Amino acid sequence: MKDMNRKLTNRYLIPAAVCLLGICGLVFYYFFFSFSARPKTEYIYIDNNDNVDSVLAKLSSIATCHGIQGLRTLLRHSTYSKHIRTGRYAVTPKDGAFKIFRCIKNGQQAPVELTIPSVRTLDRLSAELSKKLMLDSATIYRVLTDEKICHRYGYDTLTIACMFIPNTYDVYWNISPEKLLDRMKRESERFWNFKRREKAKQMGMTENEVITLASIIDEETANDAEKPMVAGMYYNRLKLRNAEYPNGMPLQADPTIKYAWRRFGLRRIYNNLLHIDSPYNTYKNVGLPPGPIRIPSVAGIDAVLDHVHHDYLYMCAKEDFSGTHNFAHTYQEHQKNAARYSKALNERGIK
């Protein structure tokens, strides 16, 4: 009798076990086996316009057949369609459909590396940032040119660029405009540590003024080693007080003329360009322009804070086109340097 019961048990138990193993194998195959058909990590972007079908369509281009079938089953039999989370999601070669499902359902994003570019205008900044974010350039530009929003962070629309310190930051692709500005404000405060703030204070300059001067330095030279020297020359002009210049010597910085005209490709600045009525015209106006003419590099900012102490008041690009400058104490010396450079430009046919 016992042998008969054992036989009956084995008769049903073994097939059941085989079926169970088969089911487990299928579950593993569809939900836990490698989802991606690609050998490296891929990323998908889910935005506000997506639904279950479009999400599956985006993933199907990188998925195995069993992987996309498994994910489709999970998405169809869950509440995912009621709350689709935007974001940038990583799909690694080892991830199964179930892990992908959990990531996109719970909003477990992979951050993007957002590099703040050294651009000249807010519209260009907006365009460059939008290339890495879900935000479009028009939305970013609208925020950056909103006086109330700028004032909330301690700036105006002419100085808001001062808050963007060039670096690479990890942010989420679907970051909101407010959170983006909050992050930039925190990074700016982190950059302006006690040491840098003290240096600016000793120079009698605000952080925005330092950044504005740094933007001119960066436009004048790409040579980081020379930037402290150039900064020292412009600082001398800012602080000069005598009978001829009771309020300071005009900076007469050619890059500000390019900015005033929005003609950034100019190779030479002629006298007819110097009469433009603009607060950025440092030939007509004494002191710094009302805001930076580009987002300056960290090297440019530190060049201002650590400027070389000398008594030069003039500089002119060297005639060898090395990207460096000849410095002069007097206008007469400067005219000689300028004549040599002008001759070199003419010889090369640069107009």
Question: What annotation goes with each model-predicted range?
Answer:
Residues 4, 23-26, 88, 155, ...:
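Intrinsically disordered, low-complexity regions
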Residues 16, 44-47, 92, 202, ...:
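Pocket-edge positions in alpha/beta enzyme catalytic cores
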Residues 14-19, 61-63, 86-88, 139-144, ...:
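N-terminal start-of-chain detector that recognizes signal peptides
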Residues 2-41:
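N-terminal type II signal-anchor transmembrane helix
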Residues 127, 134-138, 142, 149-351:
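Bacterial extracytoplasmic/cell-wall-associated proteins, especially those involved in peptidoglycan
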Residues 28-192:
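Signal peptide-directed extracytoplasmic domains
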